[in-house]
Amino acid sequence: MAEESGDASAALAALIAVAHADPASVGVRGRMLEQALIVGDQRRATEAAQLLWQAGEQRFDARMVLLVDAVQRGDWADARSLVQVDGAKTGLDLTGRLISPVVLAWIDVAARERDPARHLVRFGRIGDDQTPLWIGATILLLAGDRNAAVGQAETLNLNHRTSRVVAARLAATFAKRGDGAAASALATRLAGAPGDGLVARLSIPPVADARQGIGHWLALLGDGFARTPGGSNELSLLFTRAGQWLDPADPFGQIALAEALVQAKQVDGALAVLERGAAGAGAGNPFALRRAELLAERGEVDHAVAVAMPASGVLPTDRAWLTRFADVARRAKDPAVGEAVFDRLLALINDGEDDGELRAALFIAKADIRIKQGRWAEARPLLEAALAAGPNDPGTLNFVGYSALERRENIPLALARVEAAWLGDPANAAITDSLGWAYVVTGDVARGVPLLERAARGEPANAVINEHLGDAYWKSGRFIEARYSWRAAALVADDAMAGRLAAKLAGGLTEATLAP
């Protein structure tokens, strides 16, 4: 029952009790291993993996847990033997391409073998992604060949997210070893590299030894599975958990583990990982921001804002951070929170064409606050500013036009804007609804109904669309279909809409109950 409900801690406790009664049960130990990986109980995971291995059940997850244990103990011979197990026997043959080259190279570093980077020759790169070669530069440095490490790093690009993360760890490792010139040169390259700014917001530590190097690689693999459409949730969790057991101070690994837990529907576990990562991480850190996003997703918006807002109350100047925080802050009960974020972002972005869409979205967000407070006169100039910033953006045109239509203000201009929005994005159900409803409120019901029907097919559970369609049907004399649409809307309506729908279902459509 606990496994089915997603309560991994309760499931693990129950399985431990069963295992005491039936210690030789391979099936129970397999389930114990799975739940221990979710919870993060390395001791229980290792016990289960050992029993499975001894029973001849050489599962891939058991093999990875035993590899982590061997690396932590410094038993490099055992670690090497686990890496070199025939992949066909463990039920998952990922070793040849993903795991063994890097792990064997790090094992050679620890065992002081010659030329550990030789293992990476058959790895190379994956397309334009040079992450394995960046790993190779780090291995060369820890193997004592500083010049080769510098030379290899100078030839590599920083086009991929994981390449930038590994390069940042290499720069930190150069710095830790007193090689300021190499560290500074690499840091300069990173500062000018593309990306979402994650590396700059994380305090990336150096790689001190083979254990951390292997842990870092496993975290990178887990992150890759988490971000690949259709990627394996189980492998993402297995690799990120193993990576954190080996390299618990790696902030990138902490972020990757949290995402793997979210994918496994273990949001409480992800929140706990992020809370630990945020401790002492400073203002504008990605741990607090991601934690806030998860809290907001389950309705704890004000708690989310408090979590992400820096203790000083001073917002950072990181555009990527502010853009994500704005999506949380706009839902806060206190509109001043959202206003502060929007204003900080507006002050940071330029008037150039590339920033027009973001500027338009921010003006829309500021206007939306005033609209919800009944301050339409103050919202109007903000809406016009949004159109000036994004004159051809369908979403902006639709919001501005529909907002005016709701208030029956300057209907010809409002209708023209919604029509322009629909021409720009005719597949958008919300915009299609806006145009259909615009025709209805301007008296062209026959033209509006087909558009509203199309919108309802696109978003059949949308209360606003179904109410609009019901009203249009009633105006067309299609009373049975109108009530059907109103009932569909009532299933998901908010409190304000529910009363209006109840009145229509009881007595039909009137001017007083017409949708806004």
List each model region and its residues.
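Residue-level recognition of tetratricopeptide repeat
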Residues: 34, 68, 102, 106, ...
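Terminal, low-structured helical/coil segments at or just beyond the last alpha-helical repeat
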Residues: 211, 463, 475-516
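Alpha-helical, heptad-rich or low-complexity scaffold/stalk segments
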Residues: 1-75, 90-92, 138, 142, ...
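Alpha-helical repeat scaffolds
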Residues: 14-16, 42-54, 76-90, 113-126, ...
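Generic helix N-cap/helix-start motif at coil->alpha-helix transitions
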Residues: 7, 22-29, 44, 56-65, ...
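Structural motif corresponding to the intra-repeat A-B loop/turn of tetratricopeptide repeats
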Residues: 5, 39, 73, 111-113, ...
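Solenoidal tandem-repeat scaffolds enriched in leucines and small polar residues
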Residues: 107-148, 152-153, 163-165, 169, ...
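Alpha-helical adaptor scaffolds
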Residues: 293, 399-457
